[in-house]
Amino acid sequence: MPGYSDYIIRNASGLIPMVIEQTSRGERSYDIYSRLLKERIIFLLGEVEDHMANLVVAQLLFLESENPEKDISLYINSPGGVVTAGLAIYDTMQFIKPDVSTLCIGQAASAAALLLCAGAEGKRFCLPNSRVMIHQPLGGYRGQATDIEIHARETLAVRERLNNIMAKHTKKTPDQIMRDTERDNFMSATQAMEYGLIDKVLYDRQVAGHSTDL
Protein backbone atom coordinates (compact mmCIF):
# COMPACT_ATOMS: atom_id res chain seq x y z
CA MET A 1 0.00 0.00 0.00
CA PRO A 2 1.88 3.12 -1.20
CA GLY A 3 2.70 5.66 1.50
CA TYR A 4 2.35 3.14 4.29
CA SER A 5 4.81 1.19 6.37
CA ASP A 6 5.25 -2.48 5.57
CA TYR A 7 3.96 -3.62 8.93
CA ILE A 8 1.01 -3.26 11.22
CA ILE A 9 0.89 -2.69 14.93
CA ARG A 10 -1.87 -3.56 17.32
CA ASN A 11 -3.73 -1.36 19.74
CA ALA A 12 -3.82 -1.93 23.48
CA SER A 13 -6.67 -4.44 23.24
CA GLY A 14 -4.65 -6.57 20.84
CA LEU A 15 -7.66 -6.98 18.55
CA ILE A 16 -7.74 -4.20 15.93
CA PRO A 17 -4.71 -3.75 13.63
CA MET A 18 -3.27 -0.26 13.26
CA VAL A 19 -1.69 1.09 10.09
CA ILE A 20 1.00 3.76 9.96
CA GLU A 21 0.65 6.42 7.28
CA GLN A 22 3.77 8.29 6.21
CA THR A 23 2.97 11.93 5.45
CA SER A 24 4.98 15.09 4.88
CA ARG A 25 4.22 15.97 8.50
CA GLY A 26 5.45 12.67 9.85
CA GLU A 27 3.68 9.49 10.81
CA ARG A 28 0.00 9.11 11.61
CA SER A 29 -1.63 5.94 12.88
CA TYR A 30 -5.17 4.74 12.18
CA ASP A 31 -7.07 1.70 13.27
CA ILE A 32 -7.75 -0.31 10.14
CA TYR A 33 -11.48 0.45 10.06
CA SER A 34 -10.92 4.21 10.30
CA ARG A 35 -8.42 4.01 7.47
CA LEU A 36 -10.88 2.13 5.30
CA LEU A 37 -13.60 4.64 6.20
CA LYS A 38 -11.45 7.24 4.42
CA GLU A 39 -11.96 5.12 1.30
CA ARG A 40 -15.75 5.17 1.95
CA ILE A 41 -15.84 1.56 3.15
CA ILE A 42 -18.04 0.71 6.14
CA PHE A 43 -17.97 -2.67 7.87
CA LEU A 44 -21.09 -4.28 9.29
CA LEU A 45 -19.63 -7.09 11.37
CA GLY A 46 -21.21 -9.28 14.02
CA GLU A 47 -24.65 -9.08 15.53
CA VAL A 48 -26.93 -6.29 14.39
CA GLU A 49 -27.84 -4.44 17.60
CA ASP A 50 -28.52 -0.86 18.62
CA HIS A 51 -24.94 0.21 19.35
CA MET A 52 -23.60 -1.24 16.13
CA ALA A 53 -26.50 0.24 14.16
CA ASN A 54 -25.82 3.69 15.60
CA LEU A 55 -22.18 3.46 14.50
CA VAL A 56 -23.10 2.38 10.98
CA VAL A 57 -25.76 5.10 10.68
CA ALA A 58 -23.27 7.73 11.89
CA GLN A 59 -20.70 6.60 9.32
CA LEU A 60 -23.25 6.68 6.50
CA LEU A 61 -24.29 10.21 7.42
CA PHE A 62 -20.67 11.33 7.77
CA LEU A 63 -19.69 9.99 4.35
CA GLU A 64 -22.74 11.65 2.81
CA SER A 65 -21.64 14.97 4.29
CA GLU A 66 -18.12 14.43 2.93
CA ASN A 67 -19.30 13.76 -0.63
CA PRO A 68 -23.00 13.29 -1.44
CA GLU A 69 -22.23 12.16 -4.99
CA LYS A 70 -19.75 9.32 -4.37
CA ASP A 71 -20.78 5.74 -3.64
CA ILE A 72 -20.41 4.16 -0.22
CA SER A 73 -19.42 0.50 0.15
CA LEU A 74 -20.98 -1.55 2.95
CA TYR A 75 -19.15 -4.82 3.67
CA ILE A 76 -21.37 -7.31 5.54
CA ASN A 77 -20.41 -10.32 7.65
CA SER A 78 -23.23 -10.77 10.14
CA PRO A 79 -25.61 -13.40 11.55
CA GLY A 80 -28.34 -10.76 11.84
CA GLY A 81 -29.86 -9.53 15.07
CA VAL A 82 -32.42 -7.00 16.26
CA VAL A 83 -35.00 -6.07 13.63
CA THR A 84 -35.37 -2.44 14.72
CA ALA A 85 -31.60 -1.93 14.62
CA GLY A 86 -31.48 -3.40 11.12
CA LEU A 87 -34.32 -1.16 9.98
CA ALA A 88 -32.49 1.90 11.34
CA ILE A 89 -29.58 1.07 9.04
CA TYR A 90 -31.94 0.23 6.17
CA ASP A 91 -33.83 3.51 6.42
CA THR A 92 -30.58 5.48 6.50
CA MET A 93 -29.29 3.65 3.42
CA GLN A 94 -32.44 4.66 1.56
CA PHE A 95 -32.45 8.18 2.99
CA ILE A 96 -28.97 9.37 2.09
CA LYS A 97 -28.07 10.62 -1.37
CA PRO A 98 -25.03 8.44 -2.23
CA ASP A 99 -25.63 4.96 -3.60
CA VAL A 100 -24.75 2.30 -1.05
CA SER A 101 -23.08 -0.72 -2.60
CA THR A 102 -23.32 -3.89 -0.49
CA LEU A 103 -20.90 -6.81 -0.41
CA CYS A 104 -21.33 -10.00 1.61
CA ILE A 105 -18.11 -11.46 2.97
CA GLY A 106 -18.73 -14.62 4.97
CA GLN A 107 -22.41 -14.50 5.80
CA ALA A 108 -25.45 -12.26 5.69
CA ALA A 109 -28.32 -13.78 7.65
CA SER A 110 -31.68 -12.51 8.85
CA ALA A 111 -31.56 -8.69 9.20
CA ALA A 112 -28.14 -8.66 7.53
CA ALA A 113 -29.62 -10.36 4.45
CA LEU A 114 -32.22 -7.61 4.28
CA LEU A 115 -29.44 -4.99 4.32
CA LEU A 116 -27.51 -6.90 1.68
CA CYS A 117 -30.42 -6.84 -0.76
CA ALA A 118 -31.16 -3.19 0.08
CA GLY A 119 -28.04 -1.92 -1.67
CA ALA A 120 -28.31 0.20 -4.80
CA GLU A 121 -29.61 -1.73 -7.79
CA GLY A 122 -26.76 -3.26 -9.76
CA LYS A 123 -24.36 -2.76 -6.85
CA ARG A 124 -25.18 -5.71 -4.58
CA PHE A 125 -22.51 -8.39 -4.43
CA CYS A 126 -21.37 -11.57 -2.70
CA LEU A 127 -17.96 -13.18 -2.61
CA PRO A 128 -18.16 -16.74 -3.98
CA ASN A 129 -18.14 -18.65 -0.69
CA SER A 130 -20.53 -16.37 1.17
CA ARG A 131 -23.74 -17.70 2.67
CA VAL A 132 -27.05 -15.87 2.84
CA MET A 133 -30.03 -16.81 5.01
CA ILE A 134 -33.52 -15.34 5.11
CA HIS A 135 -36.30 -16.16 7.55
CA GLN A 136 -39.25 -14.66 9.38
CA PRO A 137 -38.62 -12.50 12.47
CA LEU A 138 -38.24 -14.37 15.73
CA GLY A 139 -40.08 -13.54 18.93
CA GLY A 140 -40.53 -15.02 22.36
CA TYR A 141 -42.60 -13.32 25.02
CA ARG A 142 -43.63 -13.92 28.61
CA GLY A 143 -46.15 -12.20 30.82
CA GLN A 144 -49.85 -11.60 30.86
CA ALA A 145 -51.91 -13.11 28.07
CA THR A 146 -52.99 -9.70 26.81
CA ASP A 147 -49.35 -8.55 26.57
CA ILE A 148 -48.40 -11.71 24.71
CA GLU A 149 -51.23 -11.04 22.26
CA ILE A 150 -50.03 -7.46 21.74
CA HIS A 151 -46.48 -8.64 21.02
CA ALA A 152 -47.76 -11.35 18.68
CA ARG A 153 -49.67 -8.75 16.64
CA GLU A 154 -46.56 -6.57 16.51
CA THR A 155 -44.44 -9.48 15.32
CA LEU A 156 -46.91 -10.21 12.53
CA ALA A 157 -46.96 -6.54 11.52
CA VAL A 158 -43.16 -6.44 11.45
CA ARG A 159 -43.06 -9.61 9.39
CA GLU A 160 -45.42 -8.09 6.83
CA ARG A 161 -43.28 -4.96 6.66
CA LEU A 162 -40.08 -6.96 6.18
CA ASN A 163 -41.72 -9.08 3.49
CA ASN A 164 -42.75 -5.93 1.61
CA ILE A 165 -39.23 -4.49 1.84
CA MET A 166 -37.59 -7.67 0.59
CA ALA A 167 -40.19 -8.02 -2.16
CA LYS A 168 -39.36 -4.51 -3.34
CA HIS A 169 -35.64 -5.24 -3.63
CA THR A 170 -35.90 -8.76 -5.06
CA LYS A 171 -38.83 -8.01 -7.38
CA LYS A 172 -40.80 -10.89 -5.92
CA THR A 173 -44.27 -10.80 -4.43
CA PRO A 174 -44.75 -10.43 -0.67
CA ASP A 175 -46.62 -13.74 -0.69
CA GLN A 176 -43.65 -15.53 -2.22
CA ILE A 177 -41.30 -13.91 0.30
CA MET A 178 -43.62 -15.07 3.09
CA ARG A 179 -43.53 -18.65 1.81
CA ASP A 180 -39.77 -18.63 1.32
CA THR A 181 -39.10 -17.27 4.82
CA GLU A 182 -41.43 -19.64 6.67
CA ARG A 183 -38.32 -21.51 7.83
CA ASP A 184 -34.61 -20.70 7.74
CA ASN A 185 -33.73 -20.52 4.05
CA PHE A 186 -30.00 -20.83 3.35
CA MET A 187 -28.51 -19.88 0.00
CA SER A 188 -25.14 -19.95 -1.67
CA ALA A 189 -23.86 -16.80 -3.35
CA THR A 190 -25.12 -18.05 -6.71
CA GLN A 191 -28.52 -18.96 -5.28
CA ALA A 192 -28.78 -15.52 -3.67
CA MET A 193 -28.11 -13.97 -7.08
CA GLU A 194 -30.76 -16.14 -8.73
CA TYR A 195 -33.24 -15.20 -6.00
CA GLY A 196 -32.62 -11.48 -6.54
CA LEU A 197 -30.93 -10.70 -3.23
CA ILE A 198 -27.74 -9.66 -5.03
CA ASP A 199 -26.77 -8.69 -8.55
CA LYS A 200 -23.46 -10.47 -9.02
CA VAL A 201 -20.99 -12.88 -7.44
CA LEU A 202 -17.55 -11.28 -7.35
CA TYR A 203 -14.47 -13.37 -8.02
CA ASP A 204 -12.06 -10.44 -8.37
CA ARG A 205 -11.96 -6.62 -8.25
CA GLN A 206 -13.02 -5.97 -11.85
CA VAL A 207 -16.47 -4.50 -11.04
CA ALA A 208 -16.44 -0.74 -11.47
CA GLY A 209 -18.04 1.46 -8.87
CA HIS A 210 -16.85 -0.52 -5.86
CA SER A 211 -14.02 0.72 -3.65
CA THR A 212 -11.37 -1.61 -5.03
CA ASP A 213 -8.19 0.45 -4.80
CA LEU A 214 -6.99 -0.93 -1.47
From Swiss-Prot:
GO terms classed as biological process: protein quality control for misfolded or incompletely synthesized proteins
Superkingdom as given in the UniProt entry: Bacteria
GO molecular function: ATP-dependent peptidase activity; ATPase binding; serine-type endopeptidase activity
Reaction(s) catalysed by this chain's protein: Hydrolysis of proteins to small peptides in the presence of ATP and magnesium. alpha-casein is the usual test substrate. In the absence of ATP, only oligopeptides shorter than five residues are hydrolyzed (such as succinyl-Leu-Tyr-|-NHMec, and Leu-Tyr-Leu-|-Tyr-Trp, in which cleavage of the -Tyr-|-Leu- and -Tyr-|-Trp bonds also occurs)
GO cellular component: cytoplasm; endopeptidase Clp complex
Main location: cytoplasm
Keywords annotated in UniProt: Cytoplasm, Hydrolase, Protease, Serine protease
SUPFAM superfamilies on file: ClpP/crotonase
Residue spans crossing the bilayer: none
EC number: 3.4.21.92
Record's function text: Cleaves peptides in various proteins in a process that requires ATP hydrolysis. Has a chymotrypsin-like activity. Plays a major role in the degradation of misfolded proteins.
Subunit structure: Fourteen ClpP subunits assemble into 2 heptameric rings which stack back to back to give a disk-like structure with a central cavity, resembling the structure of eukaryotic proteasomes.
Family note: Belongs to the peptidase S14 family.
Protein name in UniProt: ATP-dependent Clp protease proteolytic subunit
